[in-house]
Curated annotation (Swiss-Prot):
One of its GO terms (cellular component) is cytosol. It comes from Laribacter hongkongensis (strain HLHK9). It is found in: Cytoplasm. Residues 493-497 are annotated as: G2. SMART domains: RAS. This is Translation initiation factor IF-2.
Length: 959
């Protein structure tokens, strides 16, 4: 054996070298340094010294600590590494004082032997006879006590030291249950070592045995209490689930009555609960120490060898698992784990290693009962995300995404859906969807309306909208009434804005709204009809009923507004008022003298004929309507038109419909709000207040309001700001949701069609109605091949930011009655941005139309240039067939394509390979001359064939 020094020996013994030197000196081994060599004799002397010094009491205590690692999955499924430390302690004691000298070597030999057998005892499960031979159990009679019947230990109370002891395990209960269950008493085991008195045996002291028995009794009582608590909880859960199921069945039977034969048995749903609750009944009286365990009945089937109420000793260790056995029957070796989510301890993340054994979940909370799907009533707001919609329906978001994918929409979990799409998804998944009434600040407006004290209603002036086809004389008629000259100053002689005026007549005041007649201004006419009391329909006597005339009639009828027809231009030659009446009757506008309820007035705006008669008819109609409105109340009205003025900011034309608007009032109009800083009448004069039916221009709003928005005065500016911000956010969400839906709907179509050429535009106009009309008209020009893409449209002058946007996107800027400032012009020149100015909507539409026409791909046409007849064929080897032809019509060109026609049927269409006249190549051969023609890739020519020459030319297209 190789010698080692003191330091190496101390490292092997895991102790300090200085401490080992002291022990060597005490044993009489003279070593002065840790580097001194140690012989085998020195080690024997040290061992003898230690035996003599420590065995005087007749007892040897062995301690052992093992550390290992276990990998297990936690509740979330992630793998964890758990440190497991096992501590063991063994006390060996000599039985008699006389045997002490002889027993010392035996104890020294048995101690390492016992330690070596301990790790082997855990994986082994001997199925031999219960009584072991004394020669194989050194010190086991004192350590091994009788095994009491125990329930399955709780995970928190597990004792690793006791679980690691070698234990005999009885065979499965089959033929001889009494023998398999019985266990020898300690008295019987104590007599066996006496048969071999020559061999010393170590036993535990009586105090140690008594303390261990007391500890086991305490643990058994504790486990019994825990079993009772668990059993009570399971029974309570079973009763609750049975009651819940019974209530559901009653509700289902009340909703859908079924025949008695189809009803399920009452006891069927409770069967799983009974199996759980009866799994651990109260154990019977425990057998006395050393007594045999009670055996099951001999006639019990194999499956009943471990009944649900068999107590805890069935779960303590059997040599083998019975068929389909539970994890409770795995020999008691399973280490308790953390009980989570009502599952078995073995499935927790602190559970012991599985070693390939089947895992069975504790079915404590796995109650499954037949139930019909629950239908939810889902309240859907204007916009909602996919995640929120899934939460409202109590389904996974993946189900909603799957349903949307079936509808052709690719969405994410945070995608915003509009209300219409969300309602379709809710119905698709079998729930009931309803549009939600949003809990928004606008409810404050309804409450405020309810708190208003009834004000005195007074007579108000009628609001009259003048409508009709373009160039039928609407503005000229208003000029004659107002004694003004508005029409003369309008660009192109047509009205492109909605105007509001009020006129004082001897019989009262009348407010007029002048609407454009051009087809592009449909939205303006609709707003005019919405805000009006009476519609004056102007029809030119020499022109008749036109498309915009019919549209105006539809607007008036949709708004439920009476119509007064003014037949204009009766002084012109060719005027035919009777024809006008007949055409209007076809549109369900019947004159009074024909038995209808519509007044017809023949006027001439140019000559001023019968203007008073028109005013009389308007006031007469107003008297019939009995128009009233409160005066001493907060003002309410409608935004007729709005624009952005460079010096004054946002300017809105407001028609007051009820109440009185005063300077300084807080006004809310759509997403704009603010205090009224100034009020101007139609002549530009400042006024302090405006009553019902008075049109005014107001300054001071935070933003340009939308034309057609309702406006109202609020008492609290803070509340007005809150409502405006809420509306702006809601409008933005709805717009983004609709844009996203449109993108998704058109995605596959765009992929199939390929890239569509687009003309990007930026539109800036003087008023909001103008850019709405212009943008709508230009977008109507789009086709499948080219389209108008409006990047931005707004009110006001052309700014530097507009030019930068146009430069980044290669867009054209259209200024309608606006101009670019100096900075914008410089930036436009530097970046080469094209800015076009227009003041007539016709010109803008025509130029954009021509630009789109230039973007269209040209159309290809065939043009026949000549015809030749084959007179003779020449076959040349390695060259092919050459046709001797006579040009009988037109001209044959070298670049032409050739069609071979035989008996009036085209047999070949291809290219010309060579064209010769005599031996020379020529570019063309005219009518009346012969030539030689060879076709590329075609030699099956016959005499008499017709050769038709044609060219493909490109023709420019237009919209």
């Amino acid at each position: 054996m190789q010698e080692m020094n003191v330091k190496q020996f101390a490292g092997e013994l895991k102790m300090q070298p200085e401490h080992l030197l002291e022990q060597l000196k005490s044993a009489g081994v003279n070593k002065t340094s840790i580097n001194d060599a140690l012989s085998h004799v020195d080690k024997e002397r040290l061992l003898d010294f230690l035996r003599q010094g420590r065995n005087e009491g007749g007892r040897v205590t062995l301690k052992r600590k093992e550390t290992s690692e276990v990998r297990a999955n936690d509740a979330s499924g992630r793998s964890r590494t758990i440190q497991v430390e096992v501590r063991k302690k063994r006390v060996l004691e000599r039985p008699a004082e006389a045997a002490r000298p002889a027993a010392a070597p035996a104890v020294a030999q048995e101690a390492p032997a016992a330690e070596m057998r301990e790790p082997e005892a855990r994986p082994q499960a001997p199925a031999a006879e219960p009584a072991l031979k004394p020669a194989d159990r050194v010190g086991a009679p004192a350590v091994r006590t009788e095994r009491k019947p125990e329930p399955k230990p709780e995970p928190a109370k597990a004792e690793p030291a006791r679980a690691a002891k070698p234990e005999p395990k009885p065979e499965p209960v089959k033929a001889e249950p009494a023998k398999a269950v019985a266990e020898p008493a300690p008295a019987a085991e104590a007599t066996q070592p006496a048969a071999a008195p020559a061999r010393p045996v170590s036993i535990l002291s009586a105090e140690e045995i008594a303390s261990r028995e007391a500890e086991e009794r305490r643990q058994a009582e504790l486990r019994a209490r825990q079993e009772a608590l668990i059993r009570e909880r399971q029974e309570r859960e079973a009763r609750r689930m049975a009651a819940k199921l019974a209530a559901q069945q009653k509700a289902q039977e009340a909703a859908n009555p079924k025949p008695a034969a189809e009803k399920p048995a009452e006891s069927r749903p409770a069967r799983p609960a009974e199996g759980r609750s009866g799994a651990r009944p109260a154990p019977a009286a425990r057998p006395a120490a050393g007594g045999a365990r009670p055996a099951p009945a001999a006639g019990a089937p194999a499956g009943a060898a471990r009944p649900a109420g068999s107590g805890a000793d069935d779960r303590r260790g059997a040599g083998k698992k019975t068929g389909g056995g539970n994890t409770d029957r795995d020999g008691g070796k399973k280490r308790g784990g953390l009980k989570t989510r009502g599952g078995d301890a073995s499935s927790g993340w602190k559970s012991g290693s599985r070693k390939g054994k089947r895992q069975h979940q504790d079915n404590q909370h796995a109650f499954q009962a037949p139930a019909e799907p629950i239908v939810h009533e889902v309240m859907v707001p204007e916009t909602i995300t996919v995640a929120d919609l899934a939460h409202k329906m109590a389904v996974k978001a993946a189900e909603v995404i799957k349903a949307l994918m079936k509808m052709g929409m690719m969405v994410t979990i945070n995608q915003v859906l509009d209300q219409e799409t969300a309602l379709i998804v809710v119905e698709e998944l079998g729930h009931i969807g309803k549009a939600a009434k949003t809990d928004d600040p606008e409810a404050y407006l309804d409450v405020e309306d309810g708190n208003v004290v009834e004000a005195k209603l007074e007579h108000r002036a009628p609001v009259v909208t003048v409508m009709g086809h373009v160039d039928h004389g609407k503005t000229s008629l208003l000029d004659r009434i107002r004694k003004a000259k508005v029409a003369a100053g309008e660009a192109g002689g047509i009205t492109q804005h909605i105007g509001a005026y009020h006129v004082d007549t001897p019989r009262g005041m009348i407010t007029f709204l002048d609407t454009p007649g051009h087809e592009a201004f449909t939205a303006m006419r609709a707003r005019g009809a919405k805000a009006t009391d009476i519609v004056v329909l102007v029809v030119a006597a020499d022109d008749g009923v036109m498309p915009q005339t019919i549209e105006a009639i539809h607007h008036a009828k949709a708004a439920g507004v009476p119509i007064v027809v003014a037949v204009n231009k009766i002084d012109k030659q060719g005027a035919n008022p009777e024809r006008i009446r007949q055409e209007l009757v076809a549109q369900e506008v019947v004159p009074e003298d024909w038995g209808g309820d519509t007044q017809f007035v023949e006027v001439s705006a140019k000559q001023g004929l019968n203007i008073d008669g028109l005013l009389e008819a308007i006031l007469l109609q107003a008297e019939v309507l009995e128009l009233t409105a409160p005066v001493d109340a907060p003002a309410k009205g409608i935004i007729v038109e709005a624009r952005l003025d460079k010096g004054r900011g946002s300017v809105a034309t407001l028609l007051v419909q009820s109440g009185t608007l005063r300077k300084g009032d807080v006004l809310l109009a759509g997403t704009a709000f603010g205090r009224v800083r100034a009020m101007l009448d139609e002549d530009g004069k400042q006024i302090e207040e405006a009553g019902p039916s008075i049109p005014v221009e107001i300054l001071g709003l935070s933003d340009v309001p939308g034309a057609g928005e309702d406006a109202m005065v609020l008492a609290d500016e803070k509340k007005a700001r809150e409502i405006a911000n809420f509306r702006a956010g809601k409008y933005r969400d709805v717009r983004l949701a609709k844009q996203q839906a449109a993108k998704l709907e058109n995605m596959f179509a765009q992929m199939a069609e390929g890239e569509v050429r687009s003309l990007p535009l930026i539109i800036k106009a003087d008023v909001q109605g103008s850019y709405e009309a212009l943008a709508g008209s230009l977008q109507k020009l789009s086709t499948d091949e080219v389209r108008v893409q409006i990047l931005h449209s707004g009110v006001g002058g052309i700014t530097e930011s507009d030019v930068n946007l146009a430069a980044a996107s290669n867009a054209v800027i259209i200024g309608f009655n606006t101009r670019a400032d100096a900075t914008a012009r410089k930036v436009a020149e530097a970046n080469g941005v094209d800015i076009r100015y227009y003041n007539v909507i016709y010109d803008a539409i025509d130029e954009v139309k021509s630009a789109l026409s230039g973007m269209l791909a040209p159309e290809k046409k065939e043009e026949i240039t000549g015809t030749a007849e084959v007179r003779q064929l020449f076959v040349v080897s390695k060259v092919g067939t050459i046709a001797g032809c006579m040009v009988i019509d037109g001209m044959i060109k070298r670049t032409s394509r050739i069609r071979v026609i035989r008996n009036h049927v085209v047999v070949h269409d291809g290219e010309l390979d060579s064209l010769k006249r005599f031996k020379d190549d020529v570019k063309e051969v005219k009518q009346g001359y012969d030539c030689g023609i060879m076709l590329k890739g075609f030699n099956d020519l016959l005499e008499g064939d017709q050769l038709e020459a044609y060219e493909i030319v490109e023709v420019a297209r237009s919209l």
